[in-house]
Amino acid sequence: MGQASSHAAGAEGSATKPLSMLVAAVGVVYGDIGTSPLYTLKEVFSGAYGVPVNHDGVLGILSLIFWSLIWVVSIKYMMFVLRADNQGEGGIMALTALARRAAAGRKRLRTLLVVCGLIGAALFYGDSMITPAISVLSAIEGLGLAFDGIDHWVVPLSLVVLVGLFLIQKHGTARIGILFGPIMVTWFLVLGALGVYGISHYPEVLHAMNPVWAVRFFMVHTGMGVAILGAVVLALTGAEALYADMGHFGRKPIARAWFLLVLPALVLNYFGQGALLLENPDAARNPFYLLAPSWALIPLVGLSTLATVIASQAVISGAFSLTRQAIQLGYIPRMYIQHTSSDEQGQIYIGAVNWSLMVGVVLLVIGFESSGALASAYGVAVTGTMLMTTILVSAVMLLLWKWPPILAVPVLIGFLLVDGLYFAANVPKIVQGGAFPVIAGIALFVLMTTWKRGKQLLVERLDEGALPLPIFISSIRVQPPHRVQGTAVFLTARSDAVPHALLHNLLHNQVLHEQVVLLTVVYEDIPRVPPSRRFEVEAHGEGFFRVILHFGFTDEPDVPQALKLCHLDDLDFSPMRTTYFLSRETVIASKLEGMARWREALFAFMLKNANGNLRFFNLPLNRVIELGTQVEM
């Protein structure tokens, strides 16, 4: 009897796990694309585009939205992009690492793919500022339909919600995060119910599923042309989050949530809004809220605000995760990463990113004042990132997966053509307010490329005149210095030369430790390195050891913890016997070849303000000695 009960409980637990994963995925992954109905049709019919609210116009736009969701999300992302996981991890930086590995041996192609990845990552940060601003603004604007004269409170209330959201980031969202899934499931059920309510009044709107209406729209509205895709793309914002959050849930829960709940709810709601517009063209000023019965307006505003806050939280968390990956892949200066949960390694907080995003979001809300005005700036960053993702996935499919070109190329051309059209449709937005995310993206791209190139030049300068390790060991055999007890660990980027910190220590203190470890930390193009492959140890005699630690771009680089795995009889990493020696380089801009003087100055500034090895590698504060070196670049 007991065994039967246990078996039943286990069966019940295994049966409920997919459901719980689906609910959790809905709460984290689909907030952005799930809140798009708040403003998409409003922008199309009453915004800058001014599509006529008539039978052909409404059905044409609905058809474009429907088939965009099918082609871009259901086919491209669900069937292809989500398969391009880097050991389970997704996102533009994980994909860049995968594409870089796929292009091994092709230097120019490898460089081009890295540039595409950095452009996509830079644009993602611009999108991370716009998403919270437009989402929360569009939700709170619903109050204007319920109360007269409250419109001037929309901006202050939005700022209160958004600033409050950024202020709580440092404390983590683990406790309230368990509510995100149920709230977003409720949100999508409400979206679907509102859609059914609207469609029931005008069922003919379902004819928009026929792609002929999309084609007819382009034929009739030739003046708008491709430009209207700049508004339709608002329905696709958040598609990149499906891929970015894959590491948390896996491909299957994300796909199930999309096809079973999210896609049906979105389609029903868009079509319900379309039915309302066909029945009452004046509803174009805010078709989402006017679709609801008057008694449900206030609760709907409350639920919408919660949904947009959750969508914003997902974007902010995504920016934190992207930054950590970029740091460990060497594209961004090291920053202090604070873990906000003892249970979930992925829940982190990066202060510099948080405050930068908050300033950007506040400026956007104050500058644009409404979701309609902000929609004119939305789309450039989103479509740019989507286009870069398609380029990187193309490289992975052809070079890493070795798909036959006769099968892969036609599909990839279709993806690139659609993404290219959406991006081209959004380029004019740059002069309509879309310059903000583009400028932010360009600035971040310059910072990332300058940091990467600067670090390469710094290593080259330090290598000039470096003393090979075998020669140094031979010299101390001839003239052995005084040896003191304990283990000295010198962090160095090179595995075959003597670190500057070791030479400085020997020059000034005239001593060497009994055990000297030259430690190099290497980051792989994979998210996680198993413990069995964590380290390499090589003994060089005279108490010298070469240790190489390998980490993935999502691993926690805890050096003292990793060194405990180095099981070698001659090595002792006891905390009270181990001293870590670090080198702090100060860069001096010069006329030497390498980078422009302004980039050298920028790199010097970033290097000076970067988080040091001490905190980044979790080294014990009272066991670290830091020695300075000046380097001309």
Curated annotation (Swiss-Prot):
Membrane topology annotation: Multi-pass membrane protein
Disulfide feature: none
GO molecular function: potassium ion transmembrane transporter activity; symporter activity
GO annotation, cellular component aspect: plasma membrane
Superkingdom, natural source: Bacteria
Cellular compartments annotated: Cell inner membrane
Broad class of the protein's primary localization: membrane
Protein name: Probable potassium transport system protein Kup
Originating organism: Pseudomonas fluorescens (strain Pf0-1)
